[in-house]
Amino acid sequence: MIARWSAILLLLPIGALAQQKDEIRKSVYFDGGSYYIDEYQVDELYHWLDSIPNILEKFEIQLISHTDPIGGKQYNEWLSKMRGEAVYELLLQKEIPESIIHRKDWGLDNPVYSNDSYRGMMMNRRVDVILHPVVF
């Protein structure tokens, strides 16, 4: 299921994810009610991180986790935290220092996509990994 995200992402309107100037972002997607990251997504994330030269010197990393509204606010706050933690652990395994990783768990608040459709809910089940340039 998750391996099909690449095709789905091609269908998104340009600018669907508002991006700040100079930031670089990648999303890790999840099945409903899950914080499991499949091998395909792990490989995609690691490949993306490896493709960015001098990542540890040039960027700080922000993790922003999201959910769809199914299950209610309290459940989704927990699920969002678990999704953020799962991606955080992958970054630590990649030897990225804790000191440059910052987290925000939104839960079902602030969805980027409409939760009125299955597709929108599917796209809201994610953790955005955002690289912000370090300003000297």
Residue ranges and their predicted role:
Residues 18-20:
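Boundary of Sec targeting at the N-terminus
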Residues 4-15:
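Sec-dependent N-terminal signal peptides
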Residues 24-26, 33, 57-59, 99, ...:
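Envelope-exposed proteins and targeting segments
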